[in-house]
C-alpha cells in the first residue's frame, strides 16, 4: 500500500502525520509512505532524521496576511496544484491523508480530482477554512473533538482522537518530584513562542526563593534562544534551554508541570502523557481555536488556562508556586488529563483507511 501524508509546517500538523506513518509501517514494513510539505516548514529537518521521504510544493497561507501577500498566495495556487498533480502521478498512491497545514489543500484536492481515496485528520476543536472546504470532497474525516462534528457531513465523520506517536504513551512516572526537584517543561509549540519566552524570563525573579527546588526545561525556538539562555544564566536557575526538543515524549515524562500553548497536538500529547498543564492560548490563532482547545481540558479539570493578555511574570510565578505546594492537585489533574487521552487514535485511523482503500 502506498500512502501520501500531506501537510505540516508546524509540529501541530506534522507530528500526527508521523504517528500515522509509523502506524502504517508497524502493520507492514512494505507499506510506502511519502510526505508532501513545504520548503519553509519544519518537515525537512524532522522527516530526514526519521527516514521518511519528502516532496515539497510552493504554497502559502492566504488568510490574515495582508492584501498584497494574500494576493501573491492566491496567484501561486495554480502552481501548487500542478506540483501536487506531478508528485501524485509519479508516486501513484492508494490513499492521500491531509493532516492540515498549507500543503494539505492542494495535495488532497489534486488527489480527489485524480480519483484517489482521500481522508482528513482534523486536530482542532474548530477546523480551519481549508479543512472545512476539503471536508466536502474527501471520503472520510477523523476528528479529535466532538465539538467539531457540526462542520462536516455526519456520514463521513469518525471520532478517533488526535494520532500521537506511541512514545507519548510510555509508563507514567509515579514520583512527583524526582530527586527532590519540581520540573517545569516550558514551550510554545515546535517553533517557540516569543510571548511565553518573555513572560517566563519575567517570572524568574519571583521564582528565586524556590530556586533550589526547581528545574526548568525550556524550548525557546531559534530566534530567542541566546537571549533566553542568558537570562536563565543570570538568574542562576537550574535550567536547560534548547531551540527544539526532538524527543518531546521524554521531556513530557520528566516534567511535573507543563507551560505551553494550546495547539491541538500539544493538547493530545498532554493527555496522552497524562500531564498537568498551564495553557496560554495563542491569542491570534485563526478564529481563536486554541482557546477552544484549552477549554476542553479546563472543563475536565486537567489544566489551567491563563489568557496571554492577563499574564505577567508575577502571575505565572504564583501559579507555579501554587502547584508546587499542592502535589495532590497535580495528581488529580494528571488523572483527569490521562482520562482524556486516546491511545488508539493512530491505530483507529489506519484501520479505517485500510478498509476504505480495500472497499
Where are these regions (language model features)?
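Conserved nucleotide-sugar phosphate-binding/catalytic loop shared by glycosyltransferases and other
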Residues: 3-8, 30-76, 222-224, 309
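Donor-nucleotide binding loops and adjacent catalytic segments primarily
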Residues: 41, 46, 50, 172-258, ...
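Active-site-proximal region of nucleotide-activated glycan assembly enzymes
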Residues: 42, 53, 112-173
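Glycosyltransferases and closely related glycan-assembly transferases
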Residues: 83-96, 103-119, 132-137
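Acidic donor-binding loop of glycosyltransferase active sites
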Residues: 93-95, 253-268, 275-276
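C-terminal "capping" alpha-helix adjacent to the active site of nucleotide-linked donor transferases
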Residues: 304-307, 311-328
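A short, well-ordered alpha-helix in the C-terminal region of glycosyltransferases
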Residues: 329-343
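C-terminal alpha-helical cap of glycosyltransferases
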Residues: 342-359
Amino acid at each position: 500500500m502506498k500512502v501520501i501524508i500531506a501537510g505540516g509546517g508546524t509540529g501541530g500538523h506534522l507530528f500526527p502525520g508521523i504517528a500515522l506513518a509509523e502506524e502504517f509501517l508497524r502493520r507492514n514494513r512494505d507499506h510506502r509512505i511519502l510526505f508532501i510539505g513545504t520548503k519553509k516548514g519544519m518537515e525537512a529537518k524532522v522527516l530526514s532524521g526519521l527516514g521518511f521521504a519528502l516532496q515539497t510544493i510552493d504554497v502559502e497561507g492566504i488568510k490574515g496576511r495582508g492584501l498584497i501577500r494574500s494576493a501573491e498566495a492566491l496567484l501561486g495556487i495554480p502552481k501548487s496544484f500542478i506540483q501536487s498533480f506531478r508528485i501524485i502521478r509519479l508516486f501513484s498512491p492508494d490513499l492521500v491523508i491531509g493532516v492540515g497545514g498549507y500543503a494539505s489543500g492542494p495535495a488532497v484536492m489534486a488527489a480527489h480530482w485524480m480519483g484517489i481515496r482521500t481522508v482528513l485528520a482534523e486536530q482542532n476543536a474548530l477546523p480551519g477554512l481549508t479543512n472545512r472546504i476539503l471536508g466536502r470532497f474527501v471520503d472520510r474525516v477523523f476528528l479529535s473533538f466532538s465539538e467539531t462534528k457540526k462542520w462536516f457531513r455526519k456520514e463521513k465523520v469518525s471520532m478517533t482522537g488526535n494520532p500521537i506517536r506511541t512514545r507519548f504513551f510510555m509508563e507514567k512516572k509515579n514520583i512527583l518530584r524526582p530527586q527532590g526537584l519540581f520540573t517545569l517543561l516550558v514551550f510554545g509549540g515546535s517553533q517557540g513562542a516569543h510571548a511565553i519566552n518573555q513572560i517566563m524570563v519575567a517570572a524568574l525573579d519571583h521564582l528565586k526563593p524556590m530556586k533550589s527546588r526547581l528545574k526548568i526545561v525550556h524550548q525557546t525556538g531559534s530566534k530567542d534562544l541566546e537571549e533566553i539562555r542568558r537570562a536563565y544564566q543570570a538568574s542562576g536557575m537550574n535550567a536547560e534551554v534548547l531551540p527544539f526538543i526532538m524527543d518531546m515524549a521524554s521531556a513530557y515524562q520528566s516534567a511535573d508541570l507543563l507551560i505551553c500553548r494550546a495547539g491541538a497536538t500539544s493538547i493530545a500529547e498532554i493527555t496522552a502523557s497524562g500531564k498537568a498543564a498551564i495553557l496560554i492560548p495563542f491569542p491570534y490563532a485563526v478564529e481563536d481555536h486554541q482557546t477552544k482547545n484549552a477549554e476542553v481540558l479546563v472543563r475536565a479539570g486537567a489544566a489551567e488556562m491563563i489568557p496571554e493578555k492577563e499574564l505577567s511574570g508575577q502571575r505565572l510565578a504564583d501559579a507555579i508556586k501554587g502547584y508546587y505546594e499542592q502535589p495532590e492537585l497535580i495528581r488529580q489533574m494528571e488523572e483527569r488529563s490521562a482520562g482524556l487521552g486516546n491511545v488508539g487514535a493512530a491505530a483507529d485511523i489506519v484501520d479505517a483507511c485500510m478498509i476504505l482503500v480495500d472497499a
